[in-house]
Amino acid sequence: MAKQKLTQNQKRRIHSNNAKALDRHRRQTKKQIDWQEDMLGETQDGVVVTRYSMHADVENAQGEVFRCNLRRTLAGVVVGDLVIWRQGHEKLQGISGVIEAVKPRKNELSRPDYYDGLKVMASNIDRIIIVSAVLPALSLNIIDRYLVICETANIPPVIVLNKIDLLSAEARQEAEQQLKIYRDIGYRTLMISAETGENMEKLTALLSQGTSIFVGQSGVGKSSLVNQIMPEVNAQTAEISENSGLGQHTTTSSRLYHLPQGGDLIDSPGIREFGLWHLDADQITKGYREFRHFLGACKFRDCKHLNDPQCALREAVEQGKIHPVRFDNYHRLISSKDEAKSQRHFTM
């Protein structure tokens, strides 16, 4: 007998009851750990390296990590946040201190959340590494989806194609041509193999500059890359299901790591679907960087860039100034956004 699916009202009640239970536990914890001024040292700078439901691990200037409570006035503290915190003179129930404030962020990576609206995943990022793979298939549509997120967040992306050791010479040449679409509009691309180590030195050199974060569908080899870059980190490799072709999610929480060669890496749970329903059509359009030069030049202000007469974008495609694959993917994203908005479904 097939398992009956939960209705939306049932899902909301479950979420509400769970939130109430967490809130009760949070309030009980706060009652138990009541930090007084004479129990705390001076304020100091720190960076959040891991965030849990009610606590966060903060690293000080000396590289020591302390588990901290959050002040009641703080909300949405995420990995990468630069914070002001105070260490307790003694540990209380395994808690070493308290985060007092979060410094202004230079940027943040967010995703839409069914219950909470827009949820920030990490902050203060220097580049987003979009990891794709040749198996189960190289999807330029998914790459474009991530690029729209990067452009909207104003975070530079790098497109990395993993598992190239599985490609024949002909397939490799075809993949090169597909990535050339992105190089021609100014994006950096890299073809690597975590299995054989091909071009891994180029990736590690790139990661040595600032803070990076990996994004990509499950099964593209993000955990394998982390293991290759930092063998000491126990990031289990996701195995691709022979039936579905989708990997199992193995990383459970976001964490910031310091790389041996320099730089920082935020390792986050694999993202299978990255919803765009929080963006309107205009934001998605501007998320295609090569479109921007032609925006505002259409005959009609409400041009949908389909069969509208004198559409500047369509004319640019016909003139070879915009790649037709990118233009087709754009319309697919617009259509899927409306469908996803009605369902508001995606998996982490």
Swiss-Prot record:
GO terms for cellular component: cytoplasm. Zn(2+) binds at C298, C303, H305, C311. Its cofactor is Zn(2+). Residues 1-32 are annotated as: Disordered. Binds 1 zinc ion per subunit. The keyword S-adenosyl-L-methionine does not apply. One of its GO terms (molecular function) is metal ion binding. Its main location: cytoplasm. One of its GO terms (biological process) is ribosomal small subunit biogenesis. Residues 106-274 form the CP-type G domain. HAMAP family: GTPase_RsgA. This is Small ribosomal subunit biogenesis GTPase RsgA. The lineage of its organism: Bacteria, Pseudomonadati, Pseudomonadota, Gammaproteobacteria, Pasteurellales. The gene is rsgA.
